[in-house]
Amino acid sequence: AKSREVTIYRDTWGVPHIFGKTDPDAAFGLAYAHSEDDFSTIQDVIIMVKQKSGLFKGKDGAVTDFLMEWLRIYESVDKFYHSHLSPDVKLLMEGYCQGINLFAHENNDEIKLNVFPVEPRDIVMGFVFRTPMFFGLDRELESLFNLTEKPEIQSKSKKENSPTPIGSNGFAVSPKRSENGETMLVINSHQPWDGPTSWYEAHVHSEE
């Protein structure tokens, strides 16, 4: 594997600050730091895209494997991978995968299922599979299955299916009201605290 020039610092709160020589180096560092902090969730996603959920979670996991096959995720990614992704994006994903694979190699005792090494196409398949769920495909499919656990995507509130209009929340703070004299726009992104759709805080720096 290609060597990477990257340094990872942790601040007082444990947030990683990643300094890479190139963009792929920084992506490598981001993946390694993320693996240090939440390797369990990262593995859950990898198990999903490798269509091994049935082996790991039994019946409910097998439903996710079926959906991956039914939606032809692998075929779609295989068909468009080279034509729809730029060389720069592929290099970023290669660096990211190397970071995960290195952490997995160094921490064999934490591996749940033998799904390594991770490859760039695995990352793409994860996005291709999960993105339609954010637009409501999971709600359309939910009635087809009697699951104790929804397929890797956190089920949304039943209220979201209500015909009654439901708004989000956000507010602005004027310079006169803010402590630093700056205008602020505060929103709630509706992200869960944990799981595959939770956010991860990191500061990434590249010399490119």
Question: Residue spans of the language-model regions?
Answer:
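Substrate-recognition/specificity elements adjacent to catalytic centers across diverse enzyme folds
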Residues: 2-197, 205-207
